[in-house]
Each structure stands twice: as C-alpha cells, then as structure tokens.
C-alpha cells in the first residue's frame, strides 16, 4: 500500500476510541515539548553544563512514552524496540542538544517567547479538534444505540401484545361473548400495530448501522488520521523554526542544524499514522443484520400489515416521514452550499488552517448526520410504499402542534386524560383535535378543517407564538368538566370526535351548577403549581363546589378562593360522602344504534354516543343515564359497555 494513499479506514474499523486515545497522547506530548523549550530557555543561561542533563531527562520521558506514542496504549501487535518516525526525529534532536553546549540570552528569549507559545497554541488546537471529533463520535454512537434500544423496546412491546392477543383469544374461545370478541379484535389490532413498529424500527436500525460502519465511522477515522498528521506537520514546522533561530545565532552550529532539519524533513506525517495503524490492525467483521423474531406463541412473518386500523399508523408515519425527508434534503442542500466555500481550503490537507478545519468538521459532521437521517427515512418510506403504495392519497391529515397541558384534558382519540407539564400532547391547528403524543400516529386522516373541536381560547394559551414547545391549559369555569368523558378506549375516532365536540358545546352553553355547600377538611399541605389549582394547608376547612368524578380531583372553595385540589388530600364529612357518592350502577356505555325520545322521560341518543349510566335496570328492558347534561331513559339493548 502506498503511503501517499494510506487511510486509517483501510486497516482500522470499529476502533475510534483507540485512535482517539492515540491522538490524545500526541496532543499531550506537545505539552512535554513545550516544557522542554521553556526549560531549555532557562538552561541556555547556564550554558553547556545543563544541556546534557536536559537531553537525558527528555530522553527518559521519550522512552517511557515511546510505545504509547508509536502504537497507542493497547496495540494489537507489540512494536518491540521500534519507534515512530517522530520519536526517531526527536531522539536525534536530543542527541544534537548534548553536543550543543554554548548559547546566549537571545536564544533563550527566542525559545521562551516564540517556540513555547507556538507549541501551546498547537496543543490547544489539536485538543479542541479532537474533542470535536469525539463529540461527533458520541453523537453518532448514541444515535445508533438509541435506534437499537428502540428496536429492543418495540420487540418487547410486540411480544407482550402477542401475549395479550393470545389471552384475549382464549377468553373469547371460552365465553364467546360480544365483549370478548371486541377485546380480541382490539388486541389483534394493537398487536399488528406493534409488529409494524418493531419491523420498521428494525429496518431503520439495520440501514443506519450499515451507514455508520461503512461510511460514518471510516470518515471519522480518516479525519482523525488527518488531525494527527496536522499535528505532526505543524510540530515539524515548529521544530524547524526553533533550529532556524539557533542557526542564525550560532554560525558555528549551522552545519549541525542543517543535519537535524534534514532528519526532521524525513519525518513524513503519514509515517506515524502508518506505524500506528499497522500495529493496531486486527480481524473485524461487520455486525450481522437484525432479523424479525416472532413471538414464541404467535406464528408470524416479517411482512408489514396494511389491513384495517393498521393503515392509520402506516399512513400517518408515511406522511410524517415524507415531510421530514423533504426538510432533511433541504438541510443537506444548505450544508453542501456552506461546505463548498470551505473546500477551497482542502479539509484533508494537514496544512489547513485551524479555523477552516474546525468549521469544515462541524459542517461535515452535520452533513453525515443529515445523510444518515435521510437514509433512515428513505428505507422506511420505500418499505411502506412498496407494500401499501400511496396510502396518503385522499386523506385529510391533521396539522398537529406539540403542547403540554397544565390542566387535565381528554384525549379525543383514546379518551384518557392528558395532563401535566411532562405529559406531551398534540393539538390540530386546523380543527382543535387533541390527543396524546403516543396517539398522534394512530389518528385517522379525517381533519374537519375549520370545524374546531373546542374554542381555541379555551384550549390553547394564545400568548404562545410559533413554537412547538408550549403549555396549553383549559380555561373553562368548570375545570373538571374538561376531563369528564375519559372512560372509553374506542378506536372509532370519528365517533370520539363527535362525542368530544358535543361535550364541549354543552360546557359552553350550560353553566356548571355548584354542588351543595358541605364543609370538609384538608388532610395535608398542598402547593398548587398550575393555573386553576389552589394551595391549601393541613387543617383548613373548605366548601365543596364539585365532587370527584373519578379523575382524582375535587373543586373546592377555601377562604374565598376556589380551584382544584387532589381528592386524596381532603376529607369530606359523612353528609357529603353520602350526597356525592355515585350510584352503585354508575358506569359508561356506548350507543350502538340511534334512538329518538318518545317522551320527556326518554333520552335521544346517536350511534357512538358515550352515556353515563345511573340505573342499569329502570324496568322493562330500559336503562337510565346522563348524556350532555340531560338525564333520561333509553333501551338497554341499544348500548354496550365501554
């Protein structure tokens, strides 16, 4: 192999840390050389009697570090008595020092004020550039490990879903009831979604891993080689400069100085790299690809599932991926244009300026990360489109914005509560549809576009401007109504959307009536940190305004201030416990069919409505419940439990 074309990536593979340690040794070695010139400056004042001891001192230092500087701390093959070219040159410099016993103050000043400072600057530059490369490697490795961990989590989640599906199947085989059949269907849909997630994450990881080991890591290793050669090249220049000063001041030593310079000239930067690389080369193979592993109890294949509700997840994922791909390609074009201006100063040249090298390292690091991201997205998009074609055609996709909710809010998809600054959620900017972050990719593409689910002033903090990271809170006067309907996990997002909309309209048109004013007492100190949540002290008495509806919160009035407080932090008196306890039959059902009330005692319902049951057996096959604040009776066989 020619030294002119020698590259670390030809012989080193997954050895970044070994190379980084070697580069660090070289950078720290510059400190030794800097100290050498400072000490020589003082020794020059004492003439020849000090020069011999100085040469011996640094000869010993060189001997102790010879192996680490030549072949690294943990070489694959011992170098024996061999030393790298730089150390050989350094040895000849020390030999010359022994023979040079006379000098004067000017030489001492030149060594102290010129050479030592250049070495200090070179060391700081090398260390700064090494840290940049080290940070890039950590980012790339972290991203790879993150993808691998996501595959492992998806695999565990998929296998658990298979277990749940098998359990649901066994229950259905045993009972053959409508409820068990519905649970079986939901479990199967959940398992298939998690299978797709597992497969896609695995494919993305494999592609990312290939790019990491075949392109990203070799590129970093080659740049580390260039960095070391940059150090050696600049070190050679400093050494030459130091002896040029000595030559100009000591004509009698001119011939010896020329000889040393010729030896330094033989120290080609690539020689150290080649010696290090050849003594650290070892057998290495690319890690094997991951393959789909089906659950032991669920026989399956590695094919993506595009049937039924799985389409929602794949459709949303495809649209998100294509949008992200466009952004990443735009970013890549921008980075290419920035790099074009730096390529005049060749980034692979050992003589490249520090500022240019640092800028090009940062930009090329970003470029590698963007290319890796583009590769990941293209793998995912190609896989989905090859199996399901253009799923996104004809869909009315929500334009979600990620938010945090200060007060409890109901997810319009799964009907569970979204709450807390750490609980991430999404709000559609077009229709106000709210959901968990985890539900975003499961929401059907049926945006109402201009028909908001809730009034914007009540749903989102309007003081927040164009940002994806803001807090949202409900501002309804009846705070706990915003999360009353949270007892359904039905997957029909259209029905969920309509029900949520009807609930909000009821809240806007029907003022909340406070509960009977019955006193209670606060059991523990509580500090309210969010809007609508009050602060209370142990022993304070209060008036109950709204009871706990199952959310874990009550609305109370203390010393003229009303707000929410955890139900577990208060104690109600016996009269209140009796008055606010729900009927034993209280639960929720979903309407299977529409029914129009025939009298004032009956309740009109629509398919998909969620009804709170107050009496399951009202007589003659009828039940009693509450819908949109209205209480009435409805046919018991028109509904099903949720």
From Swiss-Prot:
Phorbol-ester/DAG-type zinc finger span: 397-447
SUPFAM superfamilies in UniProt: BAR/IMD domain-like, Cysteine-rich domain, SH3-domain
Keywords: Coiled coil, Cytoplasm, Cytoskeleton, Endocytosis, Metal-binding, Repeat, SH3 domain, Zinc, Zinc-finger
Signal peptide positions on this chain: none
Gene Ontology molecular function: cytoskeletal protein-membrane anchor activity; diacylglycerol binding; zinc ion binding
Protein localization: Cell tip; Cytoplasm, Cytoskeleton, Actin patch
Residue span, F-BAR domain: 6-272
Keyword Zinc-finger tagged: yes
Principal subcellular localization: other
Biological processes annotated in GO: Arp2/3 complex-mediated actin nucleation; clathrin-dependent endocytosis; regulation of actin filament polymerization
InterPro entries linked to this entry: AH/BAR_dom_sf, Bzz1_SH3_1, C1-like_sf, DAG/PE-bd, F_BAR, FCH_dom, PE/DAG-bd, SH3-like_dom_sf
GO CC annotation terms, alphabetical: actin cortical patch; cell division site; cell tip
Coiled-coil stretches noted in the UniProt entry, renumbered to this chain: 113-190
Domain named SH3: residues: 515-575, 584-642
Role: Plays a role in endocytosis and trafficking to the vacuole. Functions with type I myosins to restore polarity of the actin cytoskeleton after NaCl stress.
Family, similarity comment: Belongs to the BZZ1 family.
Protein name per UniProt: Protein BZZ1
UniProt organism field: Schizosaccharomyces pombe (strain 972 / ATCC 24843) (Fission yeast)
């Amino acid at each position: 192999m020619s030294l002119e074309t020698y590259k670390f990536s030809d012989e080193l593979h997954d050895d970044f840390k070994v190379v980084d340690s070697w580069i660090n040794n070289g950078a720290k070695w510059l400190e030794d050389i800097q100290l050498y010139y400072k000490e020589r400056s003082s020794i020059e004042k004492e003439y020849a009697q000090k020069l011999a001891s100085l040469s011996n001192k640094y000869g010993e230092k060189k001997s102790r570090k010879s192996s680490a500087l030549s072949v690294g701390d943990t070489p694959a093959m011992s170098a024996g008595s061999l030393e790298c070219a730089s150390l050989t040159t350094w040895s000849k410099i020390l030999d010359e020092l022994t023979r040079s016993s006379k000098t004067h103050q000017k030489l001492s000043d030149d060594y102290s004020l010129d050479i030592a400072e250049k070495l200090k600057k070179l060391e700081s530059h090398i260390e700064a550039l090494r840290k940049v490369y080290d940070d890039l490697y950590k980012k790339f490795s972290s991203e790879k490990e993150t993808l691998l961990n996501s595959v492992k989590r998806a695999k565990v989640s998929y296998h658990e879903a298979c277990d749940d599906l098998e359990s649901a199947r066994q229950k259905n085989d045993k009972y053959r009831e409508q409820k068990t059949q519905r649970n079986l269907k939901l479990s199967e849909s959940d398992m298939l979604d998690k299978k797709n997630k597992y497969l896609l994450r695995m494919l993305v990881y494999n592609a990312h891993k290939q790019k990491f080991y075949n392109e990203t890591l070799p590129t970093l290793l080659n740049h580390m080689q260039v960095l070391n050669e940059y150090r050696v090249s600049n070190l050679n220049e400093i050494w030459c400069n130091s002896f040029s000063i000595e030559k100009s001041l000591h004509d009698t030593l001119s011939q010896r100085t020329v000889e040393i310079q010729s030896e330094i000239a033989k120290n080609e930067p690539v020689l150290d790299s080649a010696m290090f690389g050849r003594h650290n080369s070892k057998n290495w193979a690319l890690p094997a690809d991951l393959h789909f592993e089906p659950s032991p109890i669920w026989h399956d294949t590695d094919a993506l599932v595009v049937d039924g509700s799985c389409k929602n997840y794949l459709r949303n994922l495809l649209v998100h991926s294509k949008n992200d791909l466009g952004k990443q390609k735009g970013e890549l074009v921008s980075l290419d244009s920035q790099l074009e201006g730096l390529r005049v100063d060749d980034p692979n040249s050992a003589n490249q300026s520090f500022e240019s090298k640092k800028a090009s390292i940062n930009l090329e690091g970003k470029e590698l990360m963007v290319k890796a991201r583009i590769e990941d997205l293209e793998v995912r998009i190609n896989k989905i489109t090859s199996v399901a074609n253009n799923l996104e055609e004809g869909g009315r996709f929500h334009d979600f914005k990620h938010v945090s909710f200060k007060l409890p809010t109901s997810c319009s998809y799964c009907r569970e509560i979204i709450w807390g600054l750490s609980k991430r959620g999404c709000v559609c900017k077009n229709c106000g549809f709210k959901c968990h972050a985890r539900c975003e990719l499961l929401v059907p593409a049926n945006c109402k576009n201009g028909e908001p689910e809730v009034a914007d002033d009540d749903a989102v903090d309007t003081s927040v401007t164009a940002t994806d990271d803001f807090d949202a809170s409900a501002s309804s006067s009846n705070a706990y109504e915003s999360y009353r309907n949270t007892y359904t996990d039905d997957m029909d997002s259209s029905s969920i959307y309509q029900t949520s909309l009807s609930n909000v309209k009821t809240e806007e048109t029907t003022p909340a009536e406070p509960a009977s004013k019955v006193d209670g007492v606060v059991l523990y100190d509580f500090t309210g940190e969010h809007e609508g949540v009050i602060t209370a002290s142990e022993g304070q008495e209060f008036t109950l305004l709204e009871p706990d509806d199952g959310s874990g919160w009550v609305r109370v009035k203390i010393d003229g201030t009303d707000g929410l407080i955890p139900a577990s932090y208060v104690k109600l008196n016996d009269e209140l416990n009796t008055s606010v306890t729900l009927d034993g039959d209280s639960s929720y059902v979903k309407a299977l069919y529409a029914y129009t009330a025939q009298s004032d005692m009956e309740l009109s319902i629509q398919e998909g409505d969620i009804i709170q049951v107050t009496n399951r057996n009202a007589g003659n096959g009828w039940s009693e419940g509450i819908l949109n604040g209205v209480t009435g009776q409805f046919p018991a066989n028109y509904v099903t439990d949720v």
